[in-house]
Design a protein with these regions (language model features):
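Cleft-lining beta-strand/loop regions that shape enzyme active-site pockets
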Residues: 1-195, 206
Length: 207
């Protein structure tokens, strides 16, 4: 519990080892933990590799940056999207990643749930993948991104949002999916803002 708190506030951790006469007191400043949601590189000239580790708030925007950086080194003739051991995450992140490679207004995923709001279709359109900003980070992607031959890598650790991306790209014949059977989670998370700025709630939906 000592680890939790507002960013830039101070606290201490106290460690007591077996046989130690005095405890070890370590002061530290709390900070926001930033997890990299992806990485990329050129496997060889003309062939790009993008790994998505987890689907977070800014995953699709991060993907756009990686793709732009890859195309800055020259046109691609092939692209590998690695979703192995990606446990998934936020629904709009998977819609955004899918939208980077699919034609506009293409169906990405349908969700179902106990309430009418949970029953809906998500398309490859900014209204369905933008959250908290109206800046469309996919608008200026290199033209070749929509047509470059693709392979998506998956395994038993690929779940939730990563399964949505792999399934959407495969169903629309946009990419070949290679690897082993995925986890089969069948649910995703969405973030709902609460009133009076008291926080946010995480909600699960079945896909």
């Amino acid at each position: 519990s000592q680890m939790r708190g507002r960013p830039n506030t101070r606290t201490v951790l106290t460690f007591v080892g077996k046989g130690d006469e005095k405890p070890l007191v370590v002061p530290f400043v709390r900070e926001i933990i930033k997890v990299r949601s992806g990485k990329s590189n050129l496997v060889e000239p003309g062939f790009g590799y993008v790994r998505v580790v987890q689907f977070q708030e800014a995953t699709a925007a991060s993907l756009a940056e990686h793709l732009t950086q890859l195309y800055a080194k020259g046109p691609l003739t092939g692209l590998v999207l690695d979703l192995r051991n990606d446990p998934g995450g936020l629904l709009h992140g998977s819609v955004g990643v899918s939208a980077a490679f699919l034609p506009a207004d293409t169906l990405v995923v349908s969700t179902d749930g106990r309430t009418p709001d949970a029953k809906r279709k998500y398309m490859a359109t900014p209204d369905d993948y933008l959250r908290g900003t109206r800046t469309d980070f996919l608008k200026d992607l290199p033209a070749g991104v929509k047509n470059v031959p693709m392979v998506v890598l998956v395994n038993g650790g690929s779940a939730s949002a990563s399964e949505i991306v792999a399934g959407a790209l495969q169903d629309h014949k946009r990419a070949k999916v290679l690897g082993t059977q995925t986890f089969g989670k069948g649910s995703v998370q969405t973030i709902l803002p609460l009133t009076n700025k008291i926080g946010r709630a995480s909600c699960r939906e079945r896909v």
